[in-house]
């Protein structure tokens, strides 16, 4: 994965983002510390797919902060500007709040001003009585879009 252009990213991000150990971090006005990761995911495709993760590092309760949404959008936008790849997002299941996270992510995406550039598909995988929500995000301009969607559907 190509490293992000932090100058460009921070121009668009409400919160200042910095890179640390191949991760991206920011702290909110409410002192909530977030860590964003992009990990190669070879479960569906052999290459070119990354899994996106958002982690509340200090476990502080995060109020409804629109600047978090704007920062996450800027980070995802920067991902696609530097890496025209496939992005997967799987909601964390440890606290049984994955459905809420999936709804929030879908809401953020539906409100995103550049959403017409992207294709998103959210699916639910049932595994051992746990619902796993996974989202596929890919640019509509990707020449392999139809193959990517077919492969994702076959996997699900």
Question: Where in this protein do the model-derived segments appear?
Answer:
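Non-catalytic substrate-recognition and accessory regions of acyl/acetyltransferase enzymes
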Residues: 1-156
